A protein has these predicted regions:
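Non-cytosolic coordination micro-motifs
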Residues: 1-48, 82-153
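Compositionally biased P/S/T/G-rich terminal and signal peptide-adjacent segments
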Residues: 2-12, 49-71
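Extracytoplasmic
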Residues: 20, 61-65, 73-75, 116, ...
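Short, low-complexity Ser/Thr-rich regulatory SLiMs
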Residues: 69-72, 133-135
């Protein structure tokens, strides 16, 4: 979860969201899995309060990896991940422009080490969207570049 903006801050434009992939915030893991399967999503596993999905559509793009995060209060966040073996901000830029068109300018945009970038949008109701791009080493030791889109509250 990113650091929230000051209490007086209000977004210029914000489209509230109440669900992720059709699963409402606060929904329990078992109910979520059934709903996702019934909607045709590829649930690849679950455990430790995370539901793992593969090849998920979001913002008119396919994301090879998606995770839904849960607490005692049910679903509270998600992460959609796309990686490449070479430095390319193409997906980041496409998603950024899509979010810009719907939600207006982000609350913050940060430059990260190694040419990465992070943009954060906040709603006035505690909802947030983060979009990250950056390089990281995988467990096998290879360098990959990740575009990560997160929704939460």
């Amino acid at each position: 979860r990113p650091t929230p903006p000051p209490p007086a801050w209000r977004p210029h434009a914000w489209r509230p969201f109440h669900s992720i992939l059709g699963v409402a915030f606060g929904t329990a893991v078992n109910i979520s899995i059934n709903a996702l399967l019934n909607s045709g999503y590829d649930v690849s596993g679950y455990g430790d309060n995370v539901v793992y999905l593969s090849n998920v559509p979001m913002l008119s793009m396919s994301w090879p990896v998606a995770n839904l995060y849960y607490s005692n209060g049910g679903l509270y966040g998600s992460e959609f991940v796309y990686s490449t073996s070479r430095y390319s901000m193409s997906r980041y830029n496409t998603v950024y422009n899509s979010l810009l068109g719907v939600n207006g300018a982000p609350y913050s945009v940060q430059s990260l080490a190694g040419g990465g970038r992070r943009a954060t949008w906040w709603g006035n109701d505690g909802q947030y969207i983060t979009l990250n791009f950056g390089g990281d080493y995988t467990t096998g030791g290879g360098l990959r570049y990740f575009t990560t889109l997160s929704f939460g509250r």
